[in-house]
């Protein structure tokens, strides 16, 4: 297996699972966490290693260290392994997804942004979903026909119990306290704004070629997806909130190993589902427009990344993330995109506009 994003929460969990099944790790790539990368190199002995910045190359305890996006593409070309787990965060993961598709590799995709910004250019790719909701949908949809609607669930994020009027006072520390999941900083903020769920709906559309998709808040994160059929029946996928299950579904050939403790249905409290309030989560107003106009993805994602990283660096407030997205959409409208090069151009233009 090739693992990009090895020091993030998905990567760390994937390596625990790889050790469980003695999966060979041929390549590791990370951003700046060189100390953890060196531990992973010592444990898994990959042939190839990549890091984000050449200034850290001398710190890496390996004799084949590649640098940046070009380095990732070189590894994909040179490494014969058929499986890439792409757990790079954000738009930075797109080039690796495109290259892996070109090379015919199986792509265990944790980098949902690849599909959000360039789904129409990734048709025919061999995807294995790593998001818990999409792994759940895959299970529910297998061999099924006559589907009326799909649902994925959201926890509501760090501010689910907050009043709307209190959201302009929240701190970064507050925003990083996810009630159910242990995740990286960016996706935790995306969960708090509901950008993550908006992106997951578009990801589901591209993965399963189905537009009747919605999301509901299920605060306990025990139900991950539901499938409604034309005859009125529905099915649901239950599991405890732990990413290892979805990762194992993607990287294991057989699903015969106990990964999580099963839910004891006699002990869980009553489950409740709630519609997502667009007053509290205004980003979710974009759902129907986004499904009609998937080209909006590159604008929404770039603006979201600018807004989130400004917030993470204490340059702006929590509510400014959403304002950033609507400002970019007002300026650019629906982009006409006919080539993958234009996706990169619009990403660049959006970031430049918001930083000017």
UniProtKB/Swiss-Prot annotation:
Chain positions recorded as Mn(2+) binding sites: 131, 133, 200
List of residues binding 1-deoxy-D-xylulose 5-phosphate: 112, 132-133, 155, 178, 191, 196-197, 200
UniProt keyword Metal-binding present: yes
UniProt cross-references to InterPro entries, sorted A to Z: DXP_reductoisomerase, DXP_reductoisomerase_C, DXP_reductoisomerase_N, DXPR_C, DXPR_C_sf, NAD(P)-bd_dom_sf
Reaction catalysis annotation: 2-C-methyl-D-erythritol 4-phosphate + NADP(+) = 1-deoxy-D-xylulose 5-phosphate + NADPH + H(+)
Entries under Pfam families matching the protein: DXP_redisom_C, DXP_reductoisom, DXPR_C
Pathway stated in the Swiss-Prot or TrEMBL entry: Isoprenoid biosynthesis; isopentenyl diphosphate biosynthesis via DXP pathway; isopentenyl diphosphate from 1-deoxy-D-xylulose 5-phosphate: step 1/6
UniProt keyword list: Isoprene biosynthesis, Manganese, Metal-binding, NADP, Oxidoreductase
Record's keyword annotation contains S-adenosyl-L-methionine: no
GO biological process: isopentenyl diphosphate biosynthetic process, methylerythritol 4-phosphate pathway involved in terpenoid biosynthetic process
Cofactor(s) the record lists: Mg(2+); Mn(2+)
Binding of NADPH, residues: 7-10, 31, 33, 111, 113, 184
EC assignment: 1.1.1.267
Entries under SUPFAM superfamilies matching the protein: 1-deoxy-D-xylulose-5-phosphate reductoisomerase, C-terminal domain, Glyceraldehyde-3-phosphate dehydrogenase-like, C-terminal domain, NAD(P)-binding Rossmann-fold domains
Molecular-function annotations in GO: 1-deoxy-D-xylulose-5-phosphate reductoisomerase activity; manganese ion binding; NADPH binding
EC top class, as a word: oxidoreductase
Similarity section: Belongs to the DXR family.
UniProt-listed PANTHER family: 1-DEOXY-D-XYLULOSE 5-PHOSPHATE REDUCTOISOMERASE (PTHR30525), 1-DEOXY-D-XYLULOSE 5-PHOSPHATE REDUCTOISOMERASE, CHLOROPLASTIC (PTHR30525:SF0)
HAMAP family linked to this entry: DXP_reductoisom
Function of the protein: Catalyzes the NADPH-dependent rearrangement and reduction of 1-deoxy-D-xylulose-5-phosphate (DXP) to 2-C-methyl-D-erythritol 4-phosphate (MEP).
Protein name: 1-deoxy-D-xylulose 5-phosphate reductoisomerase
Organism expressing this protein natively: Campylobacter jejuni subsp. jejuni serotype O:23/36 (strain 81-176)
Gene responsible for this protein: dxr
């Amino acid at each position: 297996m090739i693992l990009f994003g090895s020091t993030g929460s998905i990567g760390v969990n994937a390596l625990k699972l790889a050790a469980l099944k003695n999966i060979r790790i041929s390549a590791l790539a990370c951003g700046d966490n060189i100390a953890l990368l060196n531990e992973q190199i010592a444990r898994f002995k990959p042939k190839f290693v990549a890091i984000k910045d050449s200034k850290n190359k001398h710190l890496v305890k390996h004799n084949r260290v590649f640098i940046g996006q070009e380095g990732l593409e070189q590894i994909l070309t040179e490494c014969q392994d058929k499986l890439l787990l792409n757990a790079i965060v954000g738009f930075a993961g797109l080039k690796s997804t495109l290259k892996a598709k070109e090379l015919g590799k199986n792509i265990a995709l944790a980098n949902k942004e690849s599909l959000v910004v360039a789904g129409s250019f990734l048709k025919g790719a061999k995807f294995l979903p790593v998001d818990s909701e999409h792994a759940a949908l895959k299970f529910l949809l297998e061999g099924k026909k006559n589907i009326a609607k799909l649902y994925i669930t959201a926890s509501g994020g760090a501010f689910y119990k907050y009043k709307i009027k209190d959201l302009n006072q929240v701190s970064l520390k507050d925003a990083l306290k996810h009630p159910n999941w242990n995740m990286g900083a960016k996706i935790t903020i995306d969960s708090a704004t509901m950008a993550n769920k908006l992106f997951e709906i578009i990801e589901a559309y591209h993965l399963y070629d189905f537009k009747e998709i919605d999301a509901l808040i299920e605060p306990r994160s025990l139900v991950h997806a539901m499938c409604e059929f034309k005859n009125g029946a529905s099915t649901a996928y239950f599991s405890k909130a732990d990413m290892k299950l979805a990762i194992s579904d993607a990287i294991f050939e057989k699903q015969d190993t106990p990964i999580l403790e099963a839910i004891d249905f006699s002990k869980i409290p009553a489950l409740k589902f709630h519609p997502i309030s667009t007053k509290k989560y205004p980003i979710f107003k974009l759902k129907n427009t986004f499904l009609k106009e998937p080209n909006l993805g590159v604008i929404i994602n770039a603006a979201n990344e600018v807004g989130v990283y400004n917030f993470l660096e204490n340059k702006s407030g929590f509510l400014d993330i959403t304002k950033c997205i609507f400002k970019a959409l007002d300026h650019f409208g629906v982009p006409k995109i006919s080539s993958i090069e234009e996706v990169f151009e619009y990403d660049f233009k959006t970031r430049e506009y918001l930083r000017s």
